[in-house]
Amino acid sequence: MKTKELTQSKIEEVSLEILLRHAVKAKHGLEKESMRVNPDGTLSGTTHPIHLGSSLTNHYIKTDFAEPQLEYATHPRPKVEANIRELQDLHIFTIRKLENELIWPFSMPPVLPEEENEIPLGQYGTSHSGRWKTIYRHGLGLRYGRRMQTISGVHYNFSFSKVFLRQFLGKEISNFTKEEISSLYLHVIRNFLRRVHFLTYLTGSSPVFDFTFLPNPGSLKFEKHKNFTLYSTYATSLRMSEIGYTSKVQDTLGIHYNSLEEYVDRMCYAVHTPYPKYVSFSENKDAQLNPNYLQIENEFYSPIRPKQVPKGDERPLDALLQRGIEYIEIRSLDIDPYSPVGVCRSNLAFTQLILLDSLLKVSPSISEEENFSLKENLNSVIWEGRNPELKINVNGSKRNFQEAGAEYSESLRHYAKILDLHTGRRTYQEAIDFQIKKWKNPDKTPSGKLLSEILKRNIEFREKGIELAQENKRMFSYLEYSPGTLMKMEKETIRSFQEKEELEKQEIQTQYPTVKLCNH
C-alpha cells in the first residue's frame, strides 16, 4: 500500500506493533556548526587548524560558510545516544587542538568584524571541488550577506529502519519501490511542517544577539541591553526569522512536498532559472557558481528537507530522482547553549516522537492556503512564542498557543510509553515531562532562560557566550575519549590531507556538474 493511500484505520491497525517492535531501530545522525572564537569573543581570524585535517575531505570535521565555522558530522547510528557521544568526542578532539581559541556556544554569532567582507570565506584548496565550495560561499555572501551566513545550527538526520518499513508497508523489503519510500517520507515531512512551531518554541535558543550581527536593524524593533546586546522580548528562534535563514526570493518558488515529482520539478526550476538581481553579480568572475534562484540545491532554506546521498559528482536532485528519498534532515534546531555539545537527548527524543506522530497520522497534501497558515504560525512563534497571549491557527480557528502546545505534547505520551516499554527505560516519557515544564513556564524554555539570565545578571550577550565557552573548554579538556577515538581521528586527519592532495592533482574541471535528469 502506498503511503498516500494510507487511511487512519490502516495506520491505527499497524501503529502499536510497529512502535513496540521496530520504531526504536531508526537511524540517527547529527551535524552541528560552531564558530571558533578568540578569548574575547571575537571571530577567529586564523585558518582552519591543520591538526583538524582538511576541511574539504575530513569525514568528521569540516567548515561551513566561514573559515572559522566548524561543521561536525556523526555517522548514522541506531542509537542517538551514540551520536551525542561521538559529537562529544569531536569536541574533545577539537578543544585539545585549538590552543587559545574557544568554541562559541550559541546559534547567533560572536562579535563580528565591522566590515562584512572581513568575515573570511571557507577555503578548501586548489582542486575543482575545493574552488567551487569557496565560489559558492562567495555567492551566498552576495545574496544574503556574510553576517547572516555566520548563524549556526544543529541538523538531525533521521531514517526508518528497513524492518520498520516492512511492517508499516506490509511487504517484503525486496518489493519496496523508491516511490513508496519517498511517498512515506513526504508524508512525514508534511505533518512535521504542521507541528514544527511547537518544536521551535521548545528548542529555540536565539532571542538575543550581539549588535555587530545587525548594526542597522532598519524597521525591525529590538530592545537594547547595555552597550552591545539586542533582543526581542518574546522571541524563540531569531535564527529562523527574517534576519536568519529565510529568503523572500526563495518563497516565490512554490517548492512544496506533496509529491517527489512536484518537489524535484520546482527545485529543477530553481537551479536552472536565472534571477534578475543575481545576474548582475556574475559580471565579476567567480562571484558565484551561477545567477540562478539557487546556485545548488543546498541553498534552499527549509525547516526539513528530503535527502539522498549523492555518489561522486552526482547532484542531489539526480540522486533523489534515481534512488528516491533515503532520509530526512531536520534543520530547525538551534544550538542548545545549556548542552556542551549543543544538543540534548531529551530534545532529540521529543523530535523523534513528533516524527513518529507525523507518520502515524493522515497527511493530506498542503494547499497554498494551508501553507500560508503554517508559515504564519511558525513566524508568530519565532517572534512571539513566549507571549502567553499568543494565538495560532488550528484547524481554521485561533487557539492559545501554549494550551495547544501542551495538549499536543501530552498527546504523544501514548507513543512514549510504548517506546519506553520496549527499551526498558523512561527516555521518551521523561522527554515529554521535560517539555511540559516549558509549556507551563516559558522562562524554562532555552530562549526564556537565556534572555532572563542576561537581563537579570545585567551582562552582555558576548559575556555570556565567553562564560559558557570557557566552561565547556574546561570540561572537554578533562573528559576522556571513547575507546579508539583519538587514533581514529588522527588517522582521519592524515587520510583527509592525502585525499585533498590527490584531488588537486587531477585535471581541473571548469564547470560545476549539472543536474542531468532535470527537464528545465
From Swiss-Prot:
Q: Give the NCBIfam families listed for this entry.
A: glu_cys_ligase
Q: Which UniProt keywords apply?
A: ATP-binding, Glutathione biosynthesis, Ligase, Nucleotide-binding
Of the GO CC terms on this record, one is: cytosol
Got any disulfides in this one, which pairs? Answer: none
**Gene Ontology molecular-function annotations:** ATP binding; glutamate-cysteine ligase activity; metal ion binding
* Record carries keyword Nucleotide-binding: yes
Family to which this protein belongs: Belongs to the glutamate--cysteine ligase type 1 family. Type 1 subfamily.
GO biological process entries: glutathione biosynthetic process
Pfam families associated with the record: Glu_cys_ligase
Q: What's the EC number here?
A: 6.3.2.2
InterPro entries named in the record: Gln_synth/guanido_kin_cat_dom, Glu_cys_ligase, Glut_cys_ligase
As its record notes, the protein acts as a catalyst of: L-cysteine + L-glutamate + ATP = gamma-L-glutamyl-L-cysteine + ADP + phosphate + H(+)
Q: In which pathway does it act?
A: Sulfur metabolism; glutathione biosynthesis; glutathione from L-cysteine and L-glutamate: step 1/2
Q: What is this protein called?
A: Glutamate--cysteine ligase
